Design a protein with these regions (language model features):
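Short, conserved beta-strand segments of beta-strand-rich sandwich/propeller modules, principally
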Residues: 98-102
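Aromatic sugar-binding surface patches on proteins
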Residues: 76-87
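Predominantly extracytoplasmic/ectodomain segments of secreted and cell-surface proteins
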Residues: 1-38, 121-123
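C-terminal edge beta-strand
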Residues: 111-122
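Surface-exposed, short loops/turns at beta-strand junctions within beta-sandwich domains
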Residues: 90-97
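Short, surface-exposed linear segments at secondary-structure transitions and domain or protein termini
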Residues: 72-77, 122-124
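Beta-strand-rich extracellular modules
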Residues: 104-108
Length: 124
């Protein structure tokens, strides 16, 4: 499983299939330290390609799944509803360059949160 936060880019090669986990923040003890408000969790999510190199086809993205139990992402144990996962599949002739994925989640209080995830496709 690959782990990314919203502040970093992720490098992959052509023909790769990766399960990706995204930590949406910590919301413990009434302190807002991440993108989620204290006590809030993710209800649903969607992922799409928002930018890509000229002439490139979109990589294949699975549906977004909200974690229903504890999940470690980047060394932090995310409680249920604090992280999402999806599968990224790149084609054998995927165009090299930077892709920007747009993750959109809706929280249990009805708030919509959007995060851009940077994906660099290169030769490995």
């Amino acid at each position: 499983m690959s782990e990314i936060t919203c502040r970093q880019s992720y490098s992959v090669a052509r023909s790769e299939v990766r399960k990706v986990a995204v930590d949406l923040g910590e919301n413990t003890a009434g302190v807002e330290t991440g993108v989620l408000k204290a006590g809030d969790t993710v209800a649903s999510g969607a992922i799409a390609v928002s930018e890509k190199p000229t002439g490139a086809t979109d990589p294949t993205l699975s549906a977004v799944t909200v974690n229903s139990s504890g999940l470690y992402v980047g060394g932090r144990l995310c409680s249920a509803g604090e992280a999402v996962t999806f599968t990224l599949t790149l084609g054998a002739s995927q165009t090299y360059g930077r892709y920007v994925l747009l993750l959109t989640v809706v929280t249990t209080n009805g708030e919509t949160i959007k995060r851009r995830l940077l994906l660099d496709v290169g030769a490995e």
